Design a protein with these regions (language model features):
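A structural signal for short hydrophobic beta-strand segments in well-ordered beta-sheet cores
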Residues: 50-54, 111
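Intrinsically disordered, Lys/Arg-rich N-terminal extensions and targeting peptides
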Residues: 1-33
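Beta-rich strand-turn-strand
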Residues: 86-112
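Acidic-enriched and Gly/Ser
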Residues: 53, 76-86
């Protein structure tokens, strides 16, 4: 269950409810770089075209645009680089089996 009373919602994918039939929801962590964290906290995230790709039994978030952090020095992150999702092994196996057997897609709906 997602607790939203103490969390700040960073980004919402509003088109996901209209373009897809949402079957289940999962909560996952995401591996971010330092400048990505600061940019995400300021709300510079786009989830509209994002999806999850399965590579070597790991879940990778693709096409999520996190804008470069303005106050960063010359080294900044790639805005649309793949980002690893962090879940328990049993949750990863469940999602992989569902996507392969029923030809489903994993879509991010909210980032907080």
């Amino acid at each position: 269950m997602i607790k939203t009373h103490n969390t700040k919602i960073i980004a919402v994918n509003r088109k996901a409810k209209f373009n897809y039939q949402l079957m289940e929801t999962f909560e996952a962590g995401i591996s971010l770089l330092g400048t990505e964290i600061k940019s995400a906290r300021s709300g510079n995230v786009q989830l509209r075209d994002a999806f999850v790709n399965i590579i070597k039994n790991e879940l990778w978030l693709q096409n999520t645009h996190i804008s470069p952090y303005i106050m960063a020095h010359s080294e900044n992150h790639n805005p649309i680089r793949p980002r690893k999702l962090l879940l328990h092994k049993r949750e990863i196996n469940k999602l992989i089996s569902k996507t392969r057997e029923a030809n489903m897609t994993i879509i991010p709906t909210k980032m907080y």
